[in-house]
Amino acid sequence: EAVHAKAVAKHLGTEHTELYVSPEDAMAVIPRLATIWDEPFSDSSQIPTLLVSELARKHVTVCLSGDGGDELFCGYNRYPQGYKIWNTLEQVPNPIRQTVGSLIQVFPGAPIEYLLSFLPKRFQIPHFADRLPKLGQLVKEKSGESYYQRSVSHWKEPGNLVLGGIEPQTLFNRSEQFPKVSDFREQMMYLDSMTYLPDDILTKVD
C-alpha cells in the first residue's frame, strides 16, 4: 500500500513519512512486546504498529487511526464473501454438506497444489493443501454463526495449544445474546464489533 499512500499524499499535498525496516529490526522489538501490552497478545501486526508508533512519537504525541471503520461500515471482504458463500451452503441439505465436507478434509491437496503451480500466478491458490481441512470444516458447519467463527479462527480447538488450556467463553458461545437481524452481513459485523474489535484491534491501538 506504500506506493498508493505516497501517491494520495502527493495529490493532496500532505506531509508524508515512510519507514522501511529490516527483518532484524522487527525481531528486535519482540522481547519488549509483553511489557508494552501487559498481556500475551498474538496479533503479529503489533510489531509494525509499534515500529510506526515509535516513528510517530518523534514528531507528535497523539495520532488518529482508521481502526474500527471496517467493522462498523462493512469494510472487510469477508462480509460480502461470507454472505454469498453461506447463503449458497444453506441451500444444500445438511447430510450432503457433511459428506462433501468430510471428503474435502481427507482429499490429498498436494497433487492439486503442484498442478496449480503450472498455471499463471493469478490462478494459483497459496497454501492450497493446508487450506483444504478448514474448507471441509466450513462446508460442514450448521449455522451462520459457527461458519463465521470457524472462518476467522486459526485453530479449531485453541485450548489444545497449551497443557491444561481452556478457551474462555465469548459471545460466540452465547447465541442467545445475538441481535435479531435478518442480514447475515450485519450478524458478522456485530460479532466482530463485540469480539475482534475490542479484544484485538482496540487492544493494539485505541
Model-derived regions: residue spans:
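ATP-dependent adenylate-handling active sites, centered on carboxylate activation for C-N bond formation
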Residues: 1-166, 184, 204
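Short alpha-helical scaffolding segments that buttress acidic/His motifs in well-ordered protein cores
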Residues: 30-34, 191-193, 197
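Structural motif
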Residues: 42, 179-192
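Short Ser/Thr-interspersed hydrophobic loop/turn segments at strand-loop and sheet-helix junctions
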Residues: 56, 193-206
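A short, charged helix-loop
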Residues: 165-176
